């Protein structure tokens, strides 16, 4: 093991807390993501196409600002400051804790901030050129083949960098000196800002997180059982009944809020269109009843509107907009007065009976006349 360490020039372990260094890098990444999301939200209603076109440049500018305010000015990142860490020049003794030189800071900014941006642009360019093979003169075809070759080299370089990152991470876990490959190349590392500070473990955040997780799980379990729309409808009906009781007027209680609409107008369509137009009123012509169906309260609505309201009621019914009564059932509306039909039928039956009686009386009178004529003739003979 010692021969392998000497081969890679890995020194002896130092008493640095590895977890703090890894947490510092994670905090820095989360800070960049948080600021990036806030920056992009600013372009939601103001030239969103600019954000989509220059997304990588905006992220680069954000990282440059953070680099200037942290590493360049104070030789530490925000995540490192939260973990009580700072950068030092490892070429000198760790007891001196000399800050990195200007060259080291500049190299850190170029490699960390600008390196990712340049590499993404190079890969995007090579990928776009490798697919450009539609020209007929052969120029673009040759350029595409060269781009594909360069893309393979870039992929191989990415593979080598990933392997180097893995090897450096294993070495970091052993020595605790250099958390990244770039820090190893520049010979800068993280050390505690105050050596006399003791590690204080606070469980306040963990306890708060556990409480919120338990509360969230409880809500996720209980909310589907509450049936909030159904509960809301019951409360609304209860409030309506209280208002009716407070008014104490039977005539007003028997009328709904849209009782003034004509019979041919669907009150549900009228209400929906009025809400869409912001309360400015709806046209009676555009809300006429289509495929009329009759509620059990007697008022007529569109079939689709009535079915939708009853389905939303989930078995609790729905309050009619015209009479404020609870609607539970519906049936097809027939534009025929059954009472009038029954009355007409009874009238026809009475007329038939009267006509039949008159015919019988007329026949009896004719029969009597015939009998009198026959008797008179017999007496004459």
UniProtKB/Swiss-Prot annotation:
- PANTHER family attached here? PEROXISOME BIOGENESIS FACTOR 2 (PTHR48178:SF1)
- Pathway membership, UniProt: Protein modification; protein ubiquitination
Q: Recorded E.C. number(s)?
A: 2.3.2.36
The record's listing under InterPro entries reads:
PEX2/10, Pex_N, Znf_RING, Znf_RING/FYVE/PHD, Znf_RING_CS
* Protein name (database record): Peroxisomal biogenesis factor 2
Origin organism of this chain? Yarrowia lipolytica (strain CLIB 122 / E 150) (Yeast)
Provide a Gene Ontology MF annotation, just one. Answer: zinc ion binding
Q: What's this protein's function?
A: E3 ubiquitin-protein ligase component of a retrotranslocation channel required for peroxisome organization by mediating export of the PEX5 receptor from peroxisomes to the cytosol, thereby promoting PEX5 recycling. The retrotranslocation channel is composed of PEX2, PEX10 and PEX12; each subunit contributing transmembrane segments that coassemble into an open channel that specifically allows the passage of PEX5 through the peroxisomal membrane. PEX2 also regulates peroxisome organization by acting as a E3 ubiquitin-protein ligase.
Q: Which Gene Ontology CC terms are recorded?
A: peroxisomal membrane
């Amino acid at each position: 093991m010692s021969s392998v360490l000497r081969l890679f020039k890995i020194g002896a372990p130092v008493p640095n807390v590895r977890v703090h260094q890894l947490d510092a890098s994670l905090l820095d990444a989360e800070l960049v993501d948080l600021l990036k999301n806030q920056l992009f939200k600013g372009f939601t209603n103001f030239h969103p196409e600019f954000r989509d076109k220059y997304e990588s440049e905006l992220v680069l500018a954000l990282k440059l600002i953070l680099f200037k305010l942290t590493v360049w000015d104070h030789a530490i990142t925000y995540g490192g400051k939260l973990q009580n860490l700072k950068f030092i020049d490892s070429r000198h003794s760790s007891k001196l804790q000399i800050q990195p030189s200007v060259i080291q800071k500049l190299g850190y900014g170029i490699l960390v901030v600008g390196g990712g941006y340049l590499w993404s642009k190079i890969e995007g360019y090579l990928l776009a050129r490798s697919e450009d093979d539609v020209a007929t003169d052969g120029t673009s075809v040759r350029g595409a083949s060269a781009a594909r070759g360069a893309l393979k080299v870039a992929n191989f370089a990415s593979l080598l960098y990933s392997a180097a990152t893995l090897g450096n991470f294993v070495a970091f876990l052993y020595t605790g000196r250099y958390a990244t490959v770039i820090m190893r190349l520049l010979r800068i590392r993280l050390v505690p800002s105050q050596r006399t500070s003791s590690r204080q473990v606070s469980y306040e955040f963990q306890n708060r997180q556990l409480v919120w997780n338990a509360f969230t799980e409880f809500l996720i379990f209980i909310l589907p059982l509450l049936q909030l729309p159904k509960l809301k409808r019951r409360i609304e009906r209860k409030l309506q009944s209280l208002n009716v009781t407070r008014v104490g007027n039977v005539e007003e209680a028997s009328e709904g809020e849209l009782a003034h609409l004509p019979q041919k107008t669907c009150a549900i369509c009228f209400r929906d269109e009025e809400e869409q137009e912001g309360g400015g009123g709806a046209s009676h012509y555009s809300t006429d009843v289509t495929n009329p169906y009759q509620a059990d309260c007697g008022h007529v609505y569109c079939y689709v509107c009535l079915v939708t309201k009853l389905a939303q009621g989930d078995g609790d019914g729905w309050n009619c907009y015209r009479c404020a009564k609870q609607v539970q059932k519906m049936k097809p509306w027939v534009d025929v007065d059954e009472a009038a039909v029954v009355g007409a039928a009874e009238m026809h039956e009475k007329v038939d009976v009267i006509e039949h009686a008159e015919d019988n009386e007329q026949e009896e009178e004719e029969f009597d006349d015939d009998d009198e004529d026959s008797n008179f003739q017999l007496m004459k003979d």
